[in-house]
């Protein structure tokens, strides 16, 4: 029997899983239908499609990891299961973070203005640059996950120690120790895409500040299309970076949870908050993206008409 706290954890993580799968699945479906109709896919749709696929994978791995680690910690002490979960989580996690950084870079290149030669070249070649970045993101994520799998598969010391322990909690604490160095290192390295996102955000803010300063000289009265585009992009990136930061911090909490006395509570809290990022941000993308929002409105309108008739 599960405790009341376990039942609350199951309800919350199940709700986040459903929201995340439906939200990200909807984005992918809309982009896929648009791709079929137009026989081509835009750069932003390409980024979003790759992003939501990585998030669906990440949410699935995180839910499985959370349920096993919180509700069945004795099962998690098995070496092969830990290696499989950690490898897939690392791959999906890095894909998600780098695709998110790629989305921020796209917003920055598309909307911001700068006279720097490198920026102008990247802006002209934005479609080619983004596709190479996406390919690079996949290569980096695959390489890191393979390194994690190799490192963990060669470290079986915890199994020999854990099998002499009778207490499940002690087994869990012992089993996490060999994973501390590689997983913590790669969790800390994941700050690189976050820094890339921050740089893109500040470049966009700087561009808006300079653009607003120039507009004041002409006193046109009202915001021009460029200003509106800057504001929309900054709103989107602000929410994205907030969720990104929250996810990164809670991922570290999960990685260091074995150091906390009540590790089970820390792990459950970390998993629930971390899943908010890939699940909740999909809803924000739907609201802020004109095409996705209009498609959802049309779908709801058609459903309402069908119900009436």
Curated annotation (Swiss-Prot):
Protein name per Swiss-Prot or TrEMBL: Taste receptor type 2 member 8
Subcellular location: Membrane
Cystine bridges: none
Main location: membrane
Topology with respect to the bilayer: Multi-pass membrane protein
Family: Belongs to the G-protein coupled receptor T2R family.
UniProtKB keywords: G-protein coupled receptor, Glycoprotein, Membrane, Receptor, Sensory transduction, Taste, Transducer, Transmembrane, Transmembrane helix
PANTHER family (alphabetical): TASTE RECEPTOR TYPE 2 (PTHR11394), TASTE RECEPTOR TYPE 2 MEMBER 8 (PTHR11394:SF31)
Residue positions the entry lists as glycosylated: 167
Organism: Papio hamadryas
Topology Cytoplasmic: residue spans: 29-50, 104-131, 206-239, 288-309
Organism lineage: Eukaryota, Metazoa, Chordata, Craniata, Vertebrata
Signal peptide: none
GO cellular component: plasma membrane
Molecular function in Gene Ontology: bitter taste receptor activity; G protein-coupled receptor activity
SUPFAM superfamilies: Family A G protein-coupled receptor-like (SSF81321)
InterPro entries (alphabetical): TAS2R
More about this protein: Most taste cells may be activated by a limited number of bitter compounds; individual taste cells can discriminate among bitter stimuli.
Transmembrane segments: 8-28, 51-71, 83-103, 132-152, 185-205, 240-260, 267-287
Pfam families: TAS2R
Extracellular side: 1-7, 72-82, 153-184, 261-266
Function recorded in the entry: Receptor that may play a role in the perception of bitterness and is gustducin-linked. May play a role in sensing the chemical composition of the gastrointestinal content. The activity of this receptor may stimulate alpha gustducin, mediate PLC-beta-2 activation and lead to the gating of TRPM5.
């Amino acid at each position: 029997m599960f405790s009341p706290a376990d039942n609350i954890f199951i309800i919350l993580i199940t709700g986040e899983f459903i929201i995340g799968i439906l939200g990200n699945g909807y984005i992918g479906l809309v982009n896929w239908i648009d791709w079929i109709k137009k026989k081509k896919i835009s750069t932003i749709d390409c980024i979003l499609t790759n992003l939501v696929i990585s998030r669906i994978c990440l949410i699935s791995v995180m839910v499985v990891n959370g349920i096993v680690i919180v509700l069945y910690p004795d099962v998690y002490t098995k070496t092969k299961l830990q290696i499989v979960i950690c490898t897939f989580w690392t791959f999906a996690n890095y894909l998600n973070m780098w695709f998110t950084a790629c989305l921020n870079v796209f917003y920055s290149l598309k909307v911001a203005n700068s006279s720097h030669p490198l920026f102008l070249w990247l802006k002209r070649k934005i479609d080619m640059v983004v596709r190479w970045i996406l390919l690079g993101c996949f290569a980096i994520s695959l390489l890191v996950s393979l390194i994690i799998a190799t490192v963990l598969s060669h470290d079986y010391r915890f199994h020999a120690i854990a099998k002499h322990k009778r207490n499940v909690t002690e087994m869990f604490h012992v089993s996490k120790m060999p994973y501390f160095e590689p997983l913590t290192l790669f969790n800390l390295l994941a700050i690189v895409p976050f820094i890339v996102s921050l740089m893109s955000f500040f470049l966009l803010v700087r561009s808006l500040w300079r653009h607003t300063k120039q507009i004041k000289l002409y006193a046109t009265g009202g915001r021009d299309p460029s200003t509106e585009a800057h504001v929309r992009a900054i709103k989107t990136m602000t929410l994205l970076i907030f969720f990104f930061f929250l996810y990164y911090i809670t991922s570290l909490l999960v990685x260091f949870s074995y150091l906390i006395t009540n590790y089970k509570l820390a792990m459950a809290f970390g998993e629930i908050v971390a899943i908010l990022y890939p699940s909740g941000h999909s809803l924000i993308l739907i609201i802020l993206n004109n095409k996705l929002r209009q498609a959802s409105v049309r779908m709801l309108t058609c459903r309402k008409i069908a119900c009436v008739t």
